[in-house]
Amino acid sequence: MFTETYTLIERVLKACTDETEIALTDGGEHADLASTVAFALAKKRHQAPKVIAEELAVTLAANPELAGIRVEALGPYLNFSFGPKYLEETLKAAVQDNFGTAPTKPVRIVLEHTSANPNGPLHVGHIRNSILGDTLARAFRKAGYRVEVQYYVNDMGRQIAIVAYGFDHLDTGAKPGEKADHHIARVYVAANRDLEANPDKGAEIDERMQLIEKRDPATATQFRELVSRCLDGFKVTMQGLNVKHDRFIWESDFVKIGDMEKVLGRLAKIPQAVPPTEEDGTFSLDLSSCGYKKSYVLRRSDGTSVYAARDLAYHIWKGRNFDRVIDVLGADHKLITGQLVCTLRLIAEKPPEVVHFEFVSLPEGSMSTRAGTFVSADELIEEMQKRAIEEVQVRRPEIPVEERDAIAASVARAAIRYDIIKVSPEKSTVFDWKEALDFDRQSGPYVQYAHARACSILDRAGPFQERYDLLESPYEIALVKHIAKFPSIIESVVRDLRPHMLATYARDLADLFNTFYHYDPVLKGEGPVRESRLTLVLAAEKTLKEVLETLGIDALRSM
């Protein structure tokens, strides 16, 4: 209802003012929406904004299209307040299943996220990427878009050559119960130490890079087998966080089918190309026209391609097969992403929309796979589950161990996902163990608990007749009006690629529901008032469920 009402007011205002751009803002304590259009008209009409606002208020109040909406002038501002009809229509929509889900749109979106190098387990920095990307994908689907979520697999990088070297010369086998990605990390760290101690062995890494570029069958098979094992470990980690990819795209495939060479051939013909010379055998691009002083290297002097060359082929393929291309990448990728976008534009190919995120860390310190001093995502999840079990045990000591552990696993996922998604991508953050698991504050479990409370109220109430009127208290009205905004929040998230807005909305919804429940008796109410409030609880429960699922958090009925 909020989006429809916003659009209606915007259209009517444009019609009666002849303005092409109308900005409607939150009305704060005075109204639901407000407009400053009187300021723009004042310059044209040579009248005071206050006078214009008063005249417009009279005109708009008499407009039958705005029936049920109170229009008032407050100084130079126009205020719009929604009436009982708005509340009733919101409730009728919100008690339906799949509230907030938009009709299917004829737009195909490809969204790439995570795409971590397969040389060790995911750490907390990687899973910020995963959670941002997964939440965006869920929001796009909620908004009616067809989305394919991809993981771009780096199976030709130098890191993989080092992993292969380690398995050939240093591997002592996996430890009992050790995940494949953790095993690979141990071998990778050992191989790096061996190469640092014996620099002459670096020639073997160079040889492996030459072989994979030439698609040597034995090398290609070994690289893919090792990478696949690491990816299997990644999938287990991401499954524990409710993160899923639709498709894994291998960078070596773009070399195998010739797409990369086609791209390099096209780029060799543009004015920005810097061909190899006897002194410098690299092939690069001069991107100074885009503000980049450093050359964009695409092929090394030994003839092997670099990651950027394969990435260009991948992005051209995405741009030709999807309507929107979205990448979720760390802030450390800003330079290479900028060079990629510049290059794609030079050859008239579709550039990606990029969500850059700053790093997330733990209070214990930083993470580095190469040095072997990192906190893996698996360790983070395991520790959070232990803490969640302790919390659930205190709150529900009577439940069976199996039920306790299942609830704790969901609570742990909620704690991690919410604590990471609540911060806007461009801000760095430190993961807070205590705050993430706080049932009584602004956390994932806090929103889950509000949903479980709504379910409990409905279960205790038994059957009732839905009623959409008689909502009069300020707590009821505030809750309904917030529920009405859910579809517009989804639209804002996908338009601006700002998934943290969804977390803020969920927290505020839980706050408003808990405040309503505290001040307005539901089960102790009588007659029509009880039915109206139970209908509001049902609407809140369904909206909480939808927003939790869009956040990738389990909507538990009992905690």
From Swiss-Prot:
InterPro entries: aa-tRNA-synth_I_CS, Arg-tRNA-ligase, Arg-tRNA-synth_N, Arg-tRNA-synth_N_sf, ArgRS_core, DALR_anticod-bd, Rossmann-like_a/b/a_fold, tRNAsynth_Ia_anticodon-bd. GO terms for molecular function: arginine-tRNA ligase activity; ATP binding. Its EC number is 6.1.1.19. GO terms for biological process: arginyl-tRNA aminoacylation. Transmembrane segments: none annotated. It catalyses: tRNA(Arg) + L-arginine + ATP = L-arginyl-tRNA(Arg) + AMP + diphosphate. SUPFAM superfamilies: Anticodon-binding domain of a subclass of class I aminoacyl-tRNA synthetases, Arginyl-tRNA synthetase (ArgRS), N-terminal 'additional' domain, Nucleotidylyl transferase. A motif ('HIGH' region) lies at residues 116-126. It is found in: Cytoplasm. PROSITE patterns: AA_TRNA_LIGASE_I (PS00178). One of its GO terms (cellular component) is cytoplasm. It is an enzyme of class 6 (ligase). The keyword Cytoplasm applies. HAMAP family: Arg_tRNA_synth. Belongs to the class-I aminoacyl-tRNA synthetase family. PANTHER family: ARGININE--TRNA LIGASE, CYTOPLASMIC (PTHR11956:SF5), ARGINYL-TRNA SYNTHETASE (PTHR11956). This is Arginine--tRNA ligase.
